[in-house]
Amino acid sequence: MWFVSATLVVAAVIDGWKLKVPNWITFPMIVSGWIYSATCVAGYPWWEGLLYSVLGTMVGLALLLPAYAIGGMGAGDVKLLAGIGAWVWYKDTLYAFAASAIVGGIIAVLMVLAKRKWFQHQSQFWMICNEVLTVKDPEKLAAIAAERKPTMMLLPYGIPIAIGTIVYFAAAGMLM
């Protein structure tokens, strides 16, 4: 998983710099994961490796697509997790997502505390939760999020995805 980890570091650096994970990183990551799974995974026929890889890609997309649909995340972050899924299949994608969510939460809290804007962002958090529960139209939620974006602190989510996933890989012994 060294290739995936190196790709994640590059994506995180670019996301931190430009607030964007470019397609020239995510699409090759997805396709190379499919190719790797179809040709290099021992113990599986090519079609089964490819099937698990595509399933992992779909799980990665499904986990972050709702946040993207309501304007809470960029498409590059969604495709980055899909790329992870292409390489490590569905089960490890779930664990990488969980680790990334924990890291993202910690970073978000630290950012708010560092700027000393806890109460402002706490009230925005509850307002967003209320909107998600009451406004059922994803397009309206995305429009509301776009209006609010200039007042929000932005977290380039490629960073927590990279940190969380690499920490998970290390803990699971996948970097050996």
What are these regions (language model features)?
Residues 1-176:
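A membrane-topology feature that recognizes alpha-helical transmembrane segments
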